[in-house]
Amino acid sequence: MGKLKEMLAEDVTMMIASDHGFTELIYEFHANEWLQRLGWVKYRENRKNSLEDVSLGSKAYSLIPGRFYINLKGREPNGEIKLEDYENVREELKGMLLEIEGPEGGKVIKSVEKCEDVFTGDHVGIAPDLVALPNDGFDLKAGFGEMEDVFGKGPRNGMHTFENALLIIDRPGMEIEGSNLYNIAPTILGLMGIEHDPAVFDGESLI
């Protein structure tokens, strides 16, 4: 970074940002295999290769990364759960997720968030009902193929995290504590002196 900084003119601000952190990967957790063994996911006869194979009788299914959908009647193609039972089923699934332990002990899931607490905007209607965030060392997978076990080992020994992202702005007086990805685009426009309508951004410029 020092060499890059030396290449810049004195009136140029260097900004370096990442959208994720990094951690070790010990086990993959196959969410749909877990749900199937608990009787929460059922498939069409002799088929379990895709989301289309999820059949009546299913309570929920998972898509990566850590997204869980209640099989709600009227919303899902083969919906099973009635609207009046939705919240109870969602709370039950949340509790089950938080109790999962890895092969060597320790909790797999760090937290489980409800959709209305993390998503906003025009497309919130297609957001997952629950979002599970793993503890370090676990990668939440959601394939629909045949799995030997709920936990497995993959080819990688590292993975992204949702935390510990990097942000460096080489400009005196910049306050980046508590900032997030929403701040990046308006900050870049501000640094470049480009006029824009702040109302179209979810975040504010850090300048």
Functional labels for PLM-detected ranges:
Residues 2-143:
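Secreted, luminal/periplasmic, and some membrane-associated catalytic domains
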Residues 9, 39, 114, 157-158, ...:
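Glycine-centered flexibility motif
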Residues 133-185, 193:
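Low-complexity, glycine/alanine/valine/leucine- and proline-rich hydrophobic stretches
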Residues 188:
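Phosphate/pyrophosphate-binding loops and the adjoining catalytic core of nucleotide-dependent enzymes
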Residues 195-198:
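Short, polar/flexible loop-turn hinges at active-site or ligand-entry regions and domain interfaces
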Residues 200-207:
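Cytosolic regulatory/linker segments at or just downstream of nucleotide-handling modules
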